Amino acid sequence: MDTLKITEKRGANYILLELGGVISSYTFSDFREKAYTYIQENNLVVDLSNVQSIDSSGLGVFMATFNDGIETGRVFYIMNPSVEALNAINSTGFTDTFNIIHSVTEVV
């Protein structure tokens, strides 16, 4: 069965969620809850370097979190997407919309 591991870290001006595994309709609920909560209080960075795949459920969380960030004056960042994660993001046509970074030092 697919799993999604989430590790949380906090920086001065961001919350980092390191994700590993598969983001799918079977695994996304904990990620969704954390993303929707944390974007209300701080900038949110999701590290996708260890993500094996993302389905439409996961992409929907990205879009909603991005929009919530705009509404609250916070920024949603995607950091180091794996090839599989980047392909899924590219498939949406919103690649240029997301803030894709390589390091948390790029968080403003």
Model-derived features with residue positions:
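STAS-like cytosolic regulatory interaction modules
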Residues: 1-52, 66-108
